[in-house]
């Protein structure tokens, strides 16, 4: 895990971050602002290290959360975060290009969809 760093966020949540895929305050705010409920079906697009789905799942959501990320490294970080946080199969990771989203995620399947694209 040399290329990754574990970051304890408190509340039993540990994020797996790297130079390429980290997160900022905006991701924490978006995860909360989305106001997901226990039985919502949720998807985060362009998930990076998976911080938003991770925060949702640690709120004891009953349903799996989908995370779409084009970067293999980002998906690897999410897999490690799922292991570290004992999420079992509750994090569904799609290593895909969002331009093809209709090919792998059916329309109307989700109650909540978020996206926090990178910016400078």
Where do the PLM segments sit?
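Class I SAM-dependent transferase core
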Residues: 1-37
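Conserved SAM/SAH cofactor-binding pocket of Class I
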Residues: 32-120
């Amino acid at each position: 895990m040399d290329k990754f760093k574990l970051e304890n966020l408190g509340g039993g949540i540990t994020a797996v971050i790297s130079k390429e895929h980290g997160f900022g305050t905006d991701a924490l705010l978006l995860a909360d602002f989305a106001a997901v409920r226990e039985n919502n079906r949720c998807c985060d697009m362009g998930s990076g290290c998976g911080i938003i789905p991770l925060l949702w799942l640690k709120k004891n959501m009953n349903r799996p959360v989908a995370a779409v990320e084009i970067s293999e490294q980002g998906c690897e970080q999410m897999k490690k975060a799922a292991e570290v946080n004992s999420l079992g199969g509750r994090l569904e990771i799609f290593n895909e290009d969002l331009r093809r989203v209709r090919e792998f995620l059916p329309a109307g399947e989700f109650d909540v969809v978020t996206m926090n694209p990178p910016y400078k």
